[in-house]
């Protein structure tokens, strides 16, 4: 298998020039949440693991989602530090957590630096496990810094048989699977029941879906919602994934960037929604976007995949956050006022994969973590029952889909049934290593167009400038005719 070179590995992160790549990397950031400040110290591909298991398991991620899954569901956990910086396993192994936020490529930048320095680091300072997202998965799995989950770590086809195929395909190169995940991330449209009743006369998911089953109908509902004083969407980015996940080809072929026609449909729709007041001009993750999901919000709905329901939307719906003593129950904010339907197009959003780092001296522990947290049917089912996350086991999800399971947050709806149907429609064939950077640059470039600060041609030019600065190896940009 042809791996990404060290130079191009750095370039794919979008933050270094050729000169910087050749100079490698400097020190780490003091903002890192890490129990150990020592950084690995030289470039490396795979190194032979030590015969004996290490006493420290270093795990890198960008938020506390996997940390919570690990601490709550990995059977070998014995003790968790009060500040959660470390977890102690029953065999005495210390798990050290390094958490660097995702914004502006921060997580990837620091991870890349550490991986390039992996080979000469002390054993207890080497990265053992790191997490990756769908938008940049290929950058890592098509490199020498990641272990094959079967050949190197020891998982079998039988172990992985219950998982959704797309979750294996996206982290596979030339037949080598180089990551595994506990979750599948099909997307749905989450809407406010109370607003749907006022605008459409019903809050029933099946009936609401008939009004939202294609983009023309969706736009009609946006007009009806506006007439009632509501926004259809919160901001510029909300519908983006439904368009970007349905493109006809990857972003990049060779060194040429091709802007898919479907992305320009998103531009046209978002410009129309902004001009007509169908959105609140928010951006993904900003305070307005979060507020629009809460008790004072007047937004019809949000495009969310599986993790978004339980990890983001639920929290934003509460008047009193759980951190302030609030409970996840009807009566706290608008808990119970959301429901979900398929929406106008199938899509996915995100997903987190566990990778074993080349050079780790904890292969048996990595194997056990992967087995328990991504392959164990009972654990997968329990995670879903407890958290409403959609886990990566087809049999377990089908059982819940066909059961009397109900989500109190979604007004008694069994949303797992809809996710189970949507999961089979996920197509990751056009995913590529530049996706995160190009998607972010595209969205950012057109915000000035949506708000009327620049014309469309200027937004296109700004996109081209941004990506050539971020990825100097990309030479051309082709727009739809």
Predicted regions: what they are:
Residues 67, 71-76, 265-368:
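Extracytoplasmic/periplasmic substrate-binding proteins
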Residues 84-103, 122, 203-208, 271-285, ...:
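A local structural motif
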Residues 332-336, 384-444, 448, 476-481:
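Long, aromatic- and glycine/proline-rich binding clefts that accommodate carbohydrate-like moieties
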Residues 100-113, 213-217, 281-293:
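Short helix-initiation/N-cap motifs at beta->coil->alpha
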Residues 3-5, 10-138, 157, 381, ...:
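Conserved N-terminal structural module of periplasmic/extracytoplasmic solute-binding proteins
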Residues 40-48, 119, 132-188, 325-340:
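Hinge/lid segment of periplasmic solute-binding proteins
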Residues 69, 193, 370-400:
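Periplasmic-binding protein-like
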Residues 152-159, 168-239, 251-284, 358-364, ...:
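Helix-loop-helix "hinge/cap" segment bordering the ligand-binding cleft or interdomain interface
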